[in-house]
């Protein structure tokens, strides 16, 4: 897994972060994707997956937003896609504000949405607009599933480990043994 931006000379690439927002009883997940664009088809590597707010005291959105902004510092993503349905709206509201990092005694910047008109008047002027908010509907979910399925099976998306490695690891656990 990659833990920060890695730039290789002569290889065009950039990072995307995708965030599914959750709170009590569930986990907010940030998937780090490295994109390799070319003339005919883009390729995608999932290079890391982070859980934001690993324990109960860190599940509050203030802390999750701080963790995400720290990841943004490390990966310098071109875009950060956030699920802003339901609870995600509160998360989004904090992303458009500055965040104080108490551990490092610094202020992390506010970011803006590039695609959501409802944030245009309230996000800070001049902020970097790299947030992309998704309010999924049944149709959008269906379209995303179809596109993802096609990309995975065409080989355009690579994961942290292969399907075979994942099966071997899963089957070596007690939970995996119950799936036989």
How would you name each of these model-derived features?
Residues 1-114, 142, 146, 150, ...:
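RNase H-like, metal-dependent nuclease domains and their acidic two-metal-ion catalytic environment used
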Residues 102-135:
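Conserved RecA-like helicase motor-core motifs
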Residues 138:
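Glycine-rich anion-binding surface patch
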């Amino acid at each position: 897994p990659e833990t920060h931006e890695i730039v290789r000379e002569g290889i065009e690439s950039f990072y995307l972060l995708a965030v599914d927002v959750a709170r009590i009883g569930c986990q907010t997940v940030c998937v780090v994707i490295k994109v390799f664009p070319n003339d005919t088809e883009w390729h995608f590597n999932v290079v890391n997956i982070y859980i934001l707010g690993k324990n109960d005291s860190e599940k509050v959105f203030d802390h999750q937003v701080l963790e995400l902004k720290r990841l943004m510092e490390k990966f310098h993503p071109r875009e950060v896609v956030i699920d802003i349905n339901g609870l995600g709206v509160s998360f989004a509201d904090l992303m458009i504000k500055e965040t104080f990092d108490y551990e490092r005694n610094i202020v992390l910047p506010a970011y803006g949405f590039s695609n959501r008109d409802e944030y245009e008047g309230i996000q800070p002027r001049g902020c970097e607009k790299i947030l992309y908010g998704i309010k999924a509907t049944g149709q959008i979910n269906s379209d995303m599933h179809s596109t993802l399925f096609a990309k995975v099976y065409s080989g355009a998306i690579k994961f942290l480990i292969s399907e075979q490695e994942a099966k071997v690891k899963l089957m070596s656990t007690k939970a995996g043994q119950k799936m036989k």
